[in-house]
Every structure is written in structure tokens, then in C-alpha cells.
Amino acid sequence: MTQKIIRVGNIEIANDKPFVLFGGMNVLESRDLALKVCEEYVRVTEKLGIPYVFKASFDKANRSSVNSYRGPGMEEGLKIFEEIKRTFNVPVITDVHEPYQCEPVAQVCDIIQLPAFLSRQTDLVVAMAKTGAVINIKKAQFLAPHEMKHILAKCVEAGNDQLILCERGSSFGYNNLVVDMLGFGIMKQFEYPVFFDVTHSLQTPGGRADSAGGRRAQVTDLAKAGMSQGLAGLFLEAHPDPDNAKCDGPCALRLDKLEPFLAQLKQLDDLVKSFPTVETA
């Protein structure tokens, strides 16, 4: 099975290549914090030899509570992304929520992300595809892995095959998510790169009444399980003070644990991808 290669600058993204990190913070809390977080990611990934793309959101449009922090908005967020790109010479990924956001965001960011909750919204999918940008498609919590072929088809029909799939857990009753490890292999059969969003897979949606809870203590175990499947990359959020983060702190990695965490995953990825394929069908 031939695996499609997606190129972002000088980074090659494919299921059979060394894993790429989409990493950063959940939402842009401030310019200074974004620069601090990116600086640490750059230091660690350069040391470990992991290709890196900075991730953050300018607007969290699907917060549980109307009182929850959403972010600085698109205009201010894009200014911060431009500064991060200039300062650290790294690509940037962010999510869009409305068709009108697609073109201006794609002019600044190297990858635009389709949120899981919106992944079946055809008008949004088509608007994203028509930018020609690389698209990271989050698998909705309510979709089976094999159903992702329909979203891929919408993008291709609109003229864009620069696509990445991303697992972020499946609904398991109320306020819980689980990750089906068999789903990775199903999505890899589409030949597009597959990522694992370990951070959001640790959520307990609505678990704190007016916001999502999380299981940060299990991030290493779940990340190792996912990356053992031979994936194109990992999606990760970290924060210097997760307990006081403005969004999804309960499932964010502590920033000071980033290096030992990624060092183990780098070793695991190298090992898994050194194995010859064993055909068992």
C-alpha cells in the first residue's frame, strides 16, 4: 500500500516517515505566552530531530459555557501567528470555524484544520479545500473511521488532495471518550497521513459541568499506544501551568515534561518503523 506524502515547507508527512509533531497550546492566551511555548517546542524538537509545526487556536467557538474564554479572535491571532513564523521559522496550523475565515487564515497559516464537530459541514469543507492549503481533518467523536472517506471525497471533489486525517477519540457514553486502536489502520488504508491527537482524546467532555475535564496523568500511556500503530504524526498541547490554562488544561501536558515525553515517543516511532511489514490478511 503506497502512502501519500504531504509536504509542508521542507517537512515530509507520511505514515511511513519519521513522525511529525503538531504541537503548541490549546488557545492563544497572550502573545508572550505563545512565544514562550513555541520557543520550548522548538528547542526540544530541534534537539530530538522531530519535524515541528506550531499549533494554537485564535477562537474556541465550541466552548461549553458562554462565559468561557474563546481567544483573541482571527485578526489578532493571525498577527501572533505571523510573528511566530518570523521569529522561529516554523510552519503554523490553526483551525477555522466559518467559510469566510478560510482564505485569510490560509494566507498566513501553512495548515488549516477542520474541527471534529464541524467535519461534516460541507460548505466549510469546500471553502477550506478551495484555498489549496494543506488540511488537517479531525475525525468527529460521532464518526466511525471508515466514514472519513466521505470527507476526503468532498475535499478532492473541490480540488484539494493535500489532506491529513486526525484521530481524537470517540464518544463512549456521556462525558467520556475512548480511542479505538483498530481505527488507525482503517484510516491508513485511505493512504493519507494519519495523526493522533492525544490531548483531546484524554478529554472528559462536559466533565466539569461548565467545561471539559481531562486525564493528563495518562497522556504518556495513551500517546505510546497510538504511536505504536506507525503514524505520520502526533498532535499535542502543552502549557506551563495547565491547572490555570484558559482552555483544556486538565488534558494538557506540563510544558516542563515536553522533552522526556517526546524523547520516549521518538524512540518508539523509530523502533516501530524499523519493523518489516508482516502480511496477515
Swiss-Prot record:
Reading the lineage from the top rank, the first entry is: Bacteria
Please tell me which top-level EC class this enzyme sits in: transferase
MF annotations from Gene Ontology: 3-deoxy-8-phosphooctulonate synthase activity
Provide the reaction this enzyme catalyses: D-arabinose 5-phosphate + phosphoenolpyruvate + H2O = 3-deoxy-alpha-D-manno-2-octulosonate-8-phosphate + phosphate
Q: Which organism is it from?
A: Pseudomonas entomophila (strain L48)
**Pathway info:** Carbohydrate biosynthesis; 3-deoxy-D-manno-octulosonate biosynthesis; 3-deoxy-D-manno-octulosonate from D-ribulose 5-phosphate: step 2/3; Bacterial outer membrane biogenesis; lipopolysaccharide biosynthesis
Tell me one GO biological process term: keto-3-deoxy-D-manno-octulosonic acid biosynthetic process
Its protein name is 2-dehydro-3-deoxyphosphooctonate aldolase
| Recorded name of the encoding gene | kdsA
Cite a single Pfam family from the UniProt record: DAHP_synth_1
